[in-house]
Amino acid sequence: MIRFIKNGVRILARRLRRQGLRTTLIWAYGRGVPYFTGTPILKYSRVTPLVYVGPQFRKSGRSMLQSKGFKHLVNMRIEFDDAEHGLELESYCHLPTVDDTAISMEHLSRGIEFIHSAVEQGEKVYIHCSAGVGRAPTLALAYFISRGMTLADALTLVKRARPFIYIMPPQMELLRAFETESTAGATA
């Protein structure tokens, strides 16, 4: 228990230094409500009418997502498979990625294709990792880049919905390389 508290204080201090008080409080609220209620805070997670990003949810969160018309779910967590716990939706894509690391190119491609398919059908997709601040936003950013946005524009879009995201350096490197590759492919 002491180790858990020390780790929490360390994470909180790091966020305060890097993101400031306001963003850290929003992040803490965004983590606390889902933890205690099992329901993600969708008002912070709606990036577009069909693409949502957020934290892990529990059974009540799954019911809420279904009641809001969600059929597609992307889980970025290597440490937790929604299907093993009965939390998957009608259409489920598990892209196990270690926290704070870049998504593999294979998973990036599969994730983008999965999101694109849902959006093309006019259906909502919920992308999550543990906290909804690193892995899930990274995939969402890559999806928007694949649709022709610049990384800067995609970051603005996602941060407008979820201002406390924190893309780790390896994730940002991946996104920059993906943007360069996507831009080169579009002009070729």
Residue ranges and their predicted role:
Residues 1-36:
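Non-catalytic regulatory/accessory regions that flank a structured catalytic core
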Residues 5-10, 126, 140-141, 157, ...:
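Generic detector of bulky aromatic hydrophobic side chains
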Residues 180-188:
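C-terminal domain-closing interface element
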Residues 36-124, 145-179:
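Cysteine-based protein phosphatase catalytic domain of the PTP/DSP
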Residues 122-141:
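A phosphate-binding catalytic loop at a beta-strand-loop-alpha-helix junction
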